[in-house]
Amino acid sequence: MWPQPRFPPHPAMSEKTQQGKLAAAKKKLKAYWQRKSPGIPAGANRKKKINGSSPDTATSGGYHSPGDSATGIYGEGRASSTTLEDLESQYQELAVALDSSSAIISQLTENINSLVRTSKEEKKHEIHLVQKLGRSLFKLKNQTAEPLAPEPPAGPSKVEQLQDETNHLRKELESVGRQLQAEVENNQMLSLLNRRQEERLREQEERLREQEERLREQEDRLHEQEERLREQEERLCEQEERLREHEERLCEQEERLCEQEERLREQEERLHEQEERLREQEERLCEQEERLREQEERLCEQEERLREQEERLCEQEKLPGQERLLEEVEKLLEQERRQEEQERLLERERLLEEVEKLLEQERQQEEQERLLERERLLEEVEKLLEQERRQEEQERLLERERLLDEVEELLDEVEELLEQERLRQQDERLWQQETLQELERLRELERLRELERMLELGWEALYEQRAEPRSGFEELNNENKSTLQLEQQVKELKKSGGAEEPRGSESAAAARPVAGAPVPQGAWMCGQAGWTPQEHPGLSGEAVGTGEAAGGAGEAACHSFRAAENRELNITII
């Protein structure tokens, strides 16, 4: 019998230890992420919606404040950090589960190695015992081969003593051969179990390797995603800086426009004042024109008077008052000249005023055109900025959707890995249950084999008691032959260590004698090894001899019963 294997600890205890390890790993992960990103809250949820700036935060000019864009960007960072926390926690759980499974596998391999070592040591011990017995048999064979001198039959002869010793040794050899055969069968069963366990361990190692490769791939993907997120954060920071610069420029432009509007208002006020002055001047000019008309009327009247005077002078050609009239005429002409000069000056002033008005109108038109051009340029700038903002928002939305898709794919992969890990743990539990059932079945088979051996020994003793006595010489020859055959079979048993697995049901059936058939000489069959006396006559237990030989066979059967009982005790102790 092989020693009892050391089984792994109870599954409930292993589950408790795994849960403790998982809780410790989660705490360490939370502390690590809090150290790495202190601005992120601990209770952030992965499924929170990432909303942008609200429409209520718009300014009077249609521009958003720089704080609105910053809130949306930092919201993205928080959501990505929460998803990374979930992925890292799931990865740590998988790593802890892999560590626990590797520990269980190492314990099982240690148990298997210890079983193999103990079986090898027992096999070596049995081979050593068989070699000792073979040497003693060889010595006895040499002693029996020497010619014996006839002695008086004072007591039991040397031949009978040697015969008894050979019988006893033969029985011991048979028992040792059976023990060796049982050990070989047990070793075969153990080798089969070891092979199955090695195959399962190889499969588990392959699964673990595949899972490790998948975990490595996931780690690479996580690192790539972290790099992408960092690049995106850098891009978003650059975009924020650009937006801030744009907003600063727009603020400066708005201030300039406000200053220009104030200047335009001042200019408009000045223009209003100038228009009022021009209206006053027009009124004055109208008054002057009326005065000039009155003067012209007066001049016309004076001309008529002068004509009348000339006519009178013509009538009074030689009047003494001609000189006086000429002087008056000269005075009137002088007055007319002065009036004409005044009229010319007034006309010049009026023309100058009209020219100034035209120039002022041209200036006003130019200023209005400039203002319109500025307004048009500002509208175009606003349109371009609005287009840039829309494009940036679309790019951000597309990037968010892509990141969410990647995170969902990673979560699906992690769930698949967790499902595989759960199935693997179930397989391990089933495998442990199967190993326990197989060990219990092997113990039952071992008990049945012990009972079969005891029955075989009983049948052999009965058959030897019923056998007919023969001459002692033939018995010695048969015993010598049987010892030689036993040595050969022991050598064959040493060489053949990898025989086929025995069948317990067939052995139980073969251990019983056939009902209704005559039992020939040594016709009982050993169900444990599956051989007959015709195939192996050395181990057939021939009981041909005198009554003393039959008695020796009975004593050998009693010894075998005692050895079986001692073996049972050894099994129970182990």
UniProtKB/Swiss-Prot annotation:
* Composition bias, Low complexity: 508-523
Q: Which residues form a coiled coil?
A: 157-496
* Composition bias type Polar residues, residue spans: 51-62
Alphabetically list the UniProt keywords.
Answer: Coiled coil
Q: Where is this region: Disordered?
A: 1-77, 491-552
Q: Which domain of life, per UniProt?
A: Eukaryota
Say yes or no: keyword Coiled coil present.
yes
Residue ranges, compositional bias (Basic and acidic residues):
491-504
The yes or no answer to whether the keyword Transcription regulation is present is no
Give me the stretches of Pro residues compositional bias: 1-11
Recorded family membership: Belongs to the GOLGA6 family.
Protein name according to UniProt: Golgin subfamily A member 6-like protein 4
Task: Please give the organism.
Answer: Homo sapiens
Origin organism lineage? Eukaryota, Metazoa, Chordata, Craniata, Vertebrata
**Designated gene of the protein:** GOLGA6L4
